[in-house]
């Protein structure tokens, strides 16, 4: 895909990916370099690895208990089931059913495609978000109650991203789903996470505008949830 002339930094691949791809284990991003120097890939595998090695308030982000672990895995799997619909199963070649590609190419959100699928009690996407809502522990604030897990981190990232790169706002996903909102707001208040996004805010401002899409806006919900002004 060629970049629109005169845009810096280039919003699409500038050739870097062609050089990097052969060095990745699965031909995809993200990747993570382990202390041994080995490179691993696949998003959820990376999340589980990090979750087994990172603690929050004395608890690992990937649970030790098998029953809790399967709840975390199934929740993350459900989030991944939503991705193909929002990206577009046929990619940019079928742009009218590719919500993410539509905004990336500066064509705006595909409301006519998304709104029926998010209709309460009827839409297939709405049902999937309802499943996520119902899976979260009632006592909260997180999926497993008081214990933060990597599933909550993935939910925070997904809702923030989808609420700017696919939907005009997060509202369509959060309306009548208070537990999802409670979880992502709680994640955003974690100091290390808010500092991470705060440190990157200025660099996001340098991102280009393509058509009606200001690429910096892709990060607006991360800043909102982290209460970064």
Segments the model singles out, each with a brief description of its role:
Residues 86-88, 186-205:
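Charged/polar, low-hydrophobicity segments characteristic of intrinsically disordered regions
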Residues 45, 179, 192:
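Residue-level recognition of oxygen-bearing side chains
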Residues 194, 201-229:
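C-terminal helix/juxtamembrane-tail motif
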Residues 51, 55, 158-159, 197:
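Active-site-flanking alpha-helical
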Residues 57-58, 83, 166-167, 205-206:
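A short hydrophobic/aromatic micro-motif that marks alpha-helical segments and, especially, helix-coil
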Residues 71-189:
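GST-like fold's C-terminal all-alpha helical module
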Residues 41, 61-63, 143-145, 174-175, ...:
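Generic, ordered loop/turn and secondary-structure boundary motif
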Residues 1-119, 138, 219-229:
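GST-like domain detector, emphasizing the conserved glutathione-binding G-site
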